[in-house]
């Protein structure tokens, strides 16, 4: 069986646990996924299983990809992703459902693309404190980065100095999130806390 699933973030909600605590959860539409390709060590150089999720119209898919999906016997999929760790019982065209892979109270990793926040300064982007308090004399540089390097020596700015720039929109992994509930009839999984990305963002759910 595959070591993960492709899902789509639906939104957030809250549920009550057995002790009456209100638990904030993210609802993810997890599958069903279809095995669109099985890679082997001998043929491809590494072992992996490729899963497809979310149907797409044939007119929006290239001829090469249409042939790829025909081999698996499934309609074209919008999202494809590979998972490396899996068992030997996976065949081309198999359907993988959320209840086949995950259990409640299990810990999983979630990978997605974080929300893009545009061009941001160092305070928001890196958590800088600014250059000092106004009571110490400065009056117009509260959110500035301060010095970015020395002067004559080395006469340049070192690589990796944290500055303002494009924030968010990066592939991000959140680890050790707890599975609160599995709704098999709705192909949904409730995950404790938040996961990367906006609503309708595709995410990968990885087993630990």
Curated annotation (Swiss-Prot):
User: What keywords would UniProt list here?
Assistant: Ribonucleoprotein, Ribosomal protein, RNA-binding, rRNA-binding
Q: Which domain of life is it from?
A: Bacteria
What do the Gene Ontology cellular component annotations say? Answer: cytosolic large ribosomal subunit
Q: Which PROSITE patterns match?
A: RIBOSOMAL_L3 (PS00474)
Per UniProt, what is one GO molecular function of this protein?
structural constituent of ribosome
| Biological function | One of the primary rRNA binding proteins, it binds directly near the 3'-end of the 23S rRNA, where it nucleates assembly of the 50S subunit.
Instruction: Describe the family membership recorded for this protein in Swiss-Prot or TrEMBL.
Output: Belongs to the universal ribosomal protein uL3 family.
* Name of the protein described by the UniProt record: Large ribosomal subunit protein uL3
Origin species: Salinibacter ruber (strain DSM 13855 / M31)
Q: What is the lineage of its organism?
A: Bacteria, Pseudomonadati, Rhodothermota, Rhodothermia, Rhodothermales
The gene name on file is: rplC
């Amino acid at each position: 069986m595959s070591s993960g699933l492709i899902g789509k973030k639906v939104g957030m909600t809250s549920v009550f646990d057995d002790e009456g605590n209100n638990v904030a959860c993210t609802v993810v539409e997890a599958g069903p996924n279809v095995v669109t390709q099985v890679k082997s060590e001998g043929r491809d150089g590494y072992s992996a299983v490729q899963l497809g999720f979310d149907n797409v119209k044939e007119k929006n898919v290239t001829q090469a990809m249409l042939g790829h999906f025909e081999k698996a016997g499934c309609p074209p999929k919008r999202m494809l992703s590979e998972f490396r760790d899996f068992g030997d019982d996976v065949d081309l065209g198999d359907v993988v459902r959320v209840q086949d892979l995950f259990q409640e109270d299990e810990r999983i990793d979630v990978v997605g693309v974080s929300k893009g926040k545009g061009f941001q300064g160092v305070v928001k982007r890196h958590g800088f404190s600014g250059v000092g308090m106004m009571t110490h004399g400065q009056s117009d540089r509260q959110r500035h980065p301060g010095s970015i390097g020395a002067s004559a020596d080395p006469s340049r700015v070192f690589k990796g100095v944290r500055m303002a720039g494009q924030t968010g929109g990066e592939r991000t992994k959140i680890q050790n999130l707890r599975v609160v509930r599995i709704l098999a009839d709705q192909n949904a999984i409730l995950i404790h806390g938040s996961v990367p990305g906006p609503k309708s963002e595709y995410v990968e759910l990885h087993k630990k």
